[in-house]
From Swiss-Prot:
PROSITE patterns: FPG_CAT, ZF_FPG_1, ZF_FPG_2. The lineage of its organism: Bacteria, Pseudomonadati, Pseudomonadota, Gammaproteobacteria, Pasteurellales. Monomer. It comes from Histophilus somni (strain 2336) (Haemophilus somnus). Keywords: DNA damage, DNA repair, DNA-binding, Glycosidase, Hydrolase, Lyase, Metal-binding, Multifunctional enzyme, Zinc, Zinc-finger. This is Formamidopyrimidine-DNA glycosylase. Belongs to the FPG family.
Length: 270
């Protein structure tokens, strides 16, 4: 699943081809995604794009006619291609621009979304989202206070979007390994020092992943078709039974919250 660094990479990749240009039309080939594509998007004709931003894993396109909100789902991706680029299977959605380019959304599983709102502050999917992990709001004081209320596994806690957005499964595994924390550790048992280390490492790992263009494991590619290169630096994720890069102990895998969790039983003692 594309996580925060992949969405940030997508944002940076598509912005030069969209910001300041005019949407000629929006083509919806299959409206039945995770949520049905907003009908308002089919009315977009000659609408200027003012800006592009991101909230959690949502891509937000600011226009003269409200906000287009995209989510890549489990396997979705967007590309910038010429108007005459052949349509492939699973190409469900195009934003056709006046510069000879279009943004094309491809999603085999159709777990993504393309929605519209005229008021971001009242957009229902944003109501319960926690702070951005790379913002100043997300700091050790905040995380320590938040953890006091949680009896859940630490990995589940970090992946809770009401706590902090954008720390998905891949990066949660890597962050906990770098901090030497077991993924099943109870969140409210974190010390202040451990919380400080967690916040520092979350910011470090996500920033590095963004610089590397995200992580390509199966479906994610950058908007220009290149893979993300952070996968080459993964220390534990997907490395079950391989030697720990620190101590040589075999990496173990367990299921936490229906997701595979990878850890070193020596470096990350419970």
């Amino acid at each position: 699943m594309p996580e925060l660094p992949e969405v940030e990479t997508t944002l940076k990749g598509v912005s030069p081809y969209l910001k300041g240009f005019i949407i000629e039309k929006i083509v919806v080939r299959n409206p039945k995604l995770r949520w049905e594509v907003s009908k308002e998007l089919s009315t977009f004709k000659h609408v200027k794009i003012l800006n592009l931003t991101r909230r959690a894993k949502y891509l937000i396109i600011h226009t003269e006619q409200g906000y287009i909100i995209g989510h890549l789902g489990m396997s979705g991706s967007v590309r910038i291609v010429p108007h005459d680029n052949p349509v492939n299977k699973h190409d469900h959605f195009d934003i056709v621009m006046n510069n000879g380019k279009l943004l094309r959304y491809n999603d085999a599983r159709r777990f993504g979304a393309w929605l519209w709102t005229n008021n971001l502050s009242e957009f229902h999917l944003f109501f319960k989202l926690g702070p951005e992990p790379l913002s100043e709001t997300f700091n050790s004081t905040y995380l320590f206070k938040k953890s006091r209320q949680k009896s859940t596994a630490l990995k589940t806690f970090l992946m809770d979007n009401s706590v902090v957005v954008g720390v998905g499964n891949i990066y949660a595994n890597e962050i906990l390994f770098l901090c030497g924390l077991h993924p099943q550790k109870i969140a409210k048992t974190l010390t202040k020092k451990q919380t400080e280390q967690l916040v520092f490492t979350i910011k470090q790992v996500l920033n590095e992943a963004i610089e590397q263009g995200g992580t390509t494991l199966k479906d994610f590619l950058q908007p220009d078709g290149r893979p993300g290169y952070f996968a080459q630096k993964l220390l534990v994720y997907g490395n079950k039974d391989k030697p720990c890069p620190r101590c040589g102990t075999k990496i173990k895998s367990i299921i936490i919250g229906q997701r595979n969790s990878f850890f070193c039983p020596q470096c990350q003692k419970k």
